[in-house]
């Protein structure tokens, strides 16, 4: 019994034509709790395209989130609840404010969305500021517990650097381990979700989870590159010109 993971980020065609790098970031990790049970952590961020350091902000956000989780696991204090989510967001904001001050920039120059999922045998926590989504199967099929956040105007959303970020933070908690996890930035939101009701578009996810379930160890090593090729494919780029990130995890019995 173990987690099977794969994730990839690819630059959008609009960023390529503007000679911009990918401004998405992702981190996934398995940590081992004191009872030798595995803890899955997944963090995804999308740097705002309208600011100068959005990609840097996204990378700092996911790295700081993972460092925060490592510290919590080492300390043996791990309640998967709103308090953990809020403290993580505050820690990320502190890091972004420090970086902005060091570079003599405004913190809004590091604006990014932030999504996270943490899952142990005892519970699952999802957190979100901004658009993108975390789809999860908790034993009753795929669901999207938190709706992607839209801003006041079209193509706008909320960012972890916003003054009201902590109050905007949305969380979802459930008892028990997640069976399947898919976290993604808004670049593939229209492929991954039925936009009319913000429900998971199951046919989009099924091949990925089937592939994770059937893969040999050698094939698992190849999956990140295959996922990257898919995200950069003409079929995907016809639907979106944005950066794209997809992180997948499957609990294999």
Curated annotation (Swiss-Prot):
Reactions this protein catalyses: O-phospho-L-seryl-[protein] + H2O = L-seryl-[protein] + phosphate; O-phospho-L-threonyl-[protein] + H2O = L-threonyl-[protein] + phosphate
Domain of life of the source: Bacteria
UniProt-listed Enzyme Commission number(s): 3.1.3.16
Enzyme class, broadest EC rank: hydrolase
Keywords attached to this entry: Hydrolase, Manganese, Phosphoprotein, Protein phosphatase
Stated role: PP2C-like phosphatase that can dephosphorylate YegI. In vitro, can hydrolyze p-nitrophenyl phosphate (pNPP) to p-nitrophenol.
Gene Ontology MF term list: phosphatase activity; protein serine/threonine phosphatase activity
Cofactor: Mn(2+)
Coiled coil: none
Alphabetical list of Pfam families matching this protein: PP2C_2 (PF13672)
Processing and modification events after translation: Phosphorylated by YegI.
InterPro entries: PPM-type-like_dom_sf
Protein name in the entry: Serine/threonine-protein phosphatase 3
UniProt note on regulation of activity: Activity dramatically decreases in the presence of the general protein phosphatase inhibitor sodium phosphate. Slightly inhibited by sodium fluoride. Activity decreases in the presence of the metal chelator EDTA.
